[in-house]
């Protein structure tokens, strides 16, 4: 009796794991339309005595100071988020219609 109960519980756990894995893979497949990048700017930032942080001066002010709460040292990071859903389908016929044509191509 105990063996059957244990086997049943193992099957339940494997089924639950399979469902979770399927959900994770499906969610990851949908994430192709979004792209988030973080780049280290090559410098750190520190908390000054007046409560302000030293500026991150790399990459034309694209870098910002990111720090954990309670910490007096942070990292200068550059972040970028791209949502590829904002761009149209590259196979859209409107793109072909809007493509510039060479002036001689219309006379042929």
Swiss-Prot record:
Region (Disordered): 88-108
Cysteines paired by S-S bonds: 41-63, 45-65, 56-76
Presence of keyword Signal: yes
Keyword tRNA processing: no
Highest taxon in the source lineage: Eukaryota
Bias (Basic and acidic residues) ranges: 99-108
Signal peptide: 1-31
A molecular function GO annotation: C-X-C chemokine binding
Location, primary (coarse class): secreted
Entry-listed glycosylation sites: 44, 91
Record's subcellular location: Secreted
Keywords per UniProt: Disulfide bond, Glycoprotein, Secreted, Signal
A GO-annotated cellular component: extracellular region
Function per UniProt: Salivary chemokine-binding protein which binds to host chemokines CXCL1 and CXCL8.
Protein name per UniProt: Evasin P1229
Organism annotation: Ixodes ricinus
Lineage: Eukaryota, Metazoa, Ecdysozoa, Arthropoda, Chelicerata
């Amino acid at each position: 009796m105990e063996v059957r109960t244990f086997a049943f519980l193992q099957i339940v756990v494997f089924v639950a794991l399979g469902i979770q894995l399927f959900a994770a893979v499906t969610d990851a497949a949908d994430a192709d339309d979004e792209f988030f990048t973080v780049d280290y700017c090559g410098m750190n930032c520190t908390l000054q005595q007046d409560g302000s942080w030293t500026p991150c001066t790399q990459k034309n002010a694209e870098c910002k100071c990111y720090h954990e709460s309670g910490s007096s040292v942070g990292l200068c990071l550059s972040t970028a988020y791209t949502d590829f859903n904002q761009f149209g389908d590259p196979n859209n016929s409107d793109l072909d219609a809007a493509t510039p044509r060479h002036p001689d191509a219309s006379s042929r």
